[in-house]
């Protein structure tokens, strides 16, 4: 019989740098998960993606065991990196803070394809384009 799921925890952590400090410790500690075991497994799995922020979904079971799935980096993180920005615009409709090319949008969409609900690359590009516009990043051809 399958294990009974008690909780599902969603976090965004730096690749290869998970520590028992917040946000990991409190989120997993209150559910009785071995925090150090999670940190070691997460860091080992994400060591090759250093410098990226990765969303992770941790499934906690009744016997306090866990499994986790690492997703692709958020589109906003990839867009900021492509445009060379620290953060997006405070007023995206009025003030643009950076530029990305259509080719860069396609690259980001290809990276995001496994996690986006889009059926094809063109639809994924439109989703990423919307994220860019909401961050005040201009798309140039």
From Swiss-Prot:
Gene3D superfamilies: Ribosomal protein L11, C-terminal domain, Ribosomal protein L11/L12, N-terminal domain. One or more lysine residues are methylated. SUPFAM superfamilies: Ribosomal L11/L12e N-terminal domain (SSF54747), Ribosomal protein L11, C-terminal domain (SSF46906). Pfam families: Ribosomal_L11, Ribosomal_L11_N. Transmembrane segments: none annotated. Keywords: Methylation, Ribonucleoprotein, Ribosomal protein, RNA-binding, rRNA-binding. GO terms for cellular component: cytosolic large ribosomal subunit. Belongs to the universal ribosomal protein uL11 family. This is Large ribosomal subunit protein uL11. It comes from Pseudothermotoga lettingae (strain ATCC BAA-301 / DSM 14385 / NBRC 107922 / TMO). The lineage of its organism: Bacteria, Thermotogati, Thermotogota, Thermotogae, Thermotogales.
């Amino acid at each position: 019989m399958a294990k009974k799921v008690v909780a599902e925890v969603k976090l965004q952590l730096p690749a290869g740098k998970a520590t028992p400090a917040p946000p990991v410790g409190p989120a997993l500690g209150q559910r009785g998960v071995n925090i150090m075991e999670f940190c070691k497994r997460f860091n080992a799995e994400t060591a090759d993606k250093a410098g990226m922020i990765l969303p992770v979904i941790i499934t906690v079971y009744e016997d306090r065991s866990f499994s986790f799935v690492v997703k692709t980096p958020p589109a906003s993180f990839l867009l900021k990196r492509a445009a060379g920005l620290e953060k997006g615009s405070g007023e995206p409709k009025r003030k643009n803070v950076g530029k990305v090319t259509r080719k860069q949008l396609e690259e980001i969409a290809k990276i995001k394809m496994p996690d986006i609900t889009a059926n094809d690359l063109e639809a994924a590009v439109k989703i990423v384009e919307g994220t860019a516009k909401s961050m005040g990043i201009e798309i140039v051809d």
